[in-house]
Structures are given as structure tokens and as C-alpha cells.
Amino acid sequence: GDLVVVQQARSAADGEMVVAMVAEEVTLKRIYREGASQVRLQPANPALAPILIPAREVEVQGVVVGLLRRY
């Protein structure tokens, strides 16, 4: 599989790929703010549905800054 390089961070700009803690689980998704209190976590796979949740339930752990792909 691929390896991602993550820079530790507590916040991220809209559209950045983040490592986020949601309900005590870690996920890798693009983050988008939907209004003042909602966040959309968008998977890279278009076949999967985005996650819409209150912003207070998402804790950004880091921002993806690189990708190592094995061929």
C-alpha cells in the first residue's frame, strides 16, 4: 500500500487531506467546513459517502504533506 507523510497539526485549511480523530477512530480524509459548526470529511474514493458531523466532534491530528506510492 501507499505510505503518507503527515505533519502534526491541530488545524487545516479547507480541502487539505488530514488525519482526523472521530469517535475515537482515526481517519484520512479531505476536510471542508460547512458553515460555522459542521465539518465534511470527504474520502478520496468517490464511491464512499462523505461524513458530515459537528465540528466539535472532529480533532485534526495532522496534515498530509507527502505520499510514497509503491509500484
Listing of model-derived features with the role each one plays in the protein:
Residues 2-71:
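Acidic/glycine-rich C-terminal interaction modules and beta/coil loop segments
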